Amino acid sequence: MQPLLVLATLLGSALAGTIPLQSANYHGYKVVRLSGEDTSKISHIVSQLGLETWKFPKSANANVDIVVPPKKIAEFEKMSHAAGLKKQIMHEDLGRSIASEMSFRPYSYGGANDTWFQSYHKYEDHLKFMKDFQSAHAENTEIVTSGKSHEGRDITGVHVWGSGGKGSKPAVVFHGTVHAREWITTMTVEYILNQLLEDKEAGAALLDKYDFYIFPITNPDGFVFSTDHDRMWRKNREQNEKGCYGTDLNRNWPYEWDGDGSTTDPCSETYRGPSPGSAPETKASTSFIKGLADGAGVKMFVDWHSYSQLFMTPYGYSCSARAPNDDVLQEMASSFADAVKAVHGTSFTTGPICSTIYQANGNSVDWVVDEIKGETAFAAELRDTGMHGFVLPPDQIIPSGEETWAGVKAMFSKLK
């Protein structure tokens, strides 16, 4: 969910998407965290130098994570020092960090083997993983697709059920990789999928109550582009006006679509699209979830993002509105955060989306709660809080999976 508040393009036409297959080169780029009491000083630096931000503060003394290209480093250092801002280096060389992260391990047949969660993977291997997982558990799983992406890829997931039989229980829907560069969500959602059947006692207890629909990659075109051409790509790959590419799929859902938490600029990272629900990926997801709602109903929806370590409740479109069952949602979110912390000491902040991270209209969580009356819905921001940001080292995949699975189990214990 994390937005890029782009005040100027990082790589000219490459980041804006005007050259669809140009590979972005981030060697020599620094990612720097600034903080200070007067955030207007930071805004001035970002604006004057035309820099990209990974994260911008909601209040004074909050952190701002900024990407600085080589040719602007000297001026950035001069201006930040003159403004008296605190500085911390997140990535000394973003390109080197990306290269290390992209050491994809070859995939071996057989599902979640000992090496799967030790590295990130290409799109084709994720498809193989899901198919192998389903084959290994054919008696209570099936491959499902919600529809096709703009470029014609299937939006693939796995349906897992328990003793009641296929489709007999209320649905739980987990979405990963809505934003293409948030790779830790892909792996963590797959870790949850694996644990539903590997954690025999806890998994069986959940599957006897609910049918799970797990979609590790809901933005396949964007994800492929992020692995093959631009690691920092966020949106889908539709071509827009001005020759720019991509709609922000978490600003395109057809509920409270037209608001301050997105933009009409086709070149912006938070472009909401030309109309509510216009993106093929959004159409596919809304249609699929509506079908579940018309069946046994939707018990829970979680939209998994990174980064910032947050577990949030509705709403995103308004900072004053609250869901009808807000007290229950807050209790569940707190249970998630407490259980996560007990595993590796990772702290998550909880609260409504708008007041916790930023205003976001046209998002999936609000749509699920108000349009199809899903009982519970949450938006998560996984590891970390900014030391690595979107480029999270592979050695954090398993810890992220372990703590998130603990949080999921705890959250369900509060669900009646």
Swiss-Prot record:
The active site is at 381 (proton donor/acceptor). Pfam families: Peptidase_M14 (PF00246), Propep_M14 (PF02244). Residues 1-17 form the signal peptide. Keywords: Carboxypeptidase, Disulfide bond, Hydrolase, Metal-binding, Metalloprotease, Protease, Secreted, Signal, Virulence, Zinc, Zymogen. Zn(2+) binds at residues 179, 182, 305. Substrate binds at residues 179-182, 234, 250-251, 306-307. GO terms for cellular component: extracellular region. It is an enzyme of class 3 (hydrolase). The keyword Secreted applies. Residues 264-283 are annotated as: Disordered. PROSITE patterns: CARBOXYPEPT_ZN_1, PEPTIDASE_M14. Its cofactor is Zn(2+). Belongs to the peptidase M14 family. This is Metallocarboxypeptidase A-like protein MCYG_01475. It comes from Arthroderma otae (strain ATCC MYA-4605 / CBS 113480). The lineage of its organism: Eukaryota, Fungi, Dikarya, Ascomycota, Pezizomycotina.
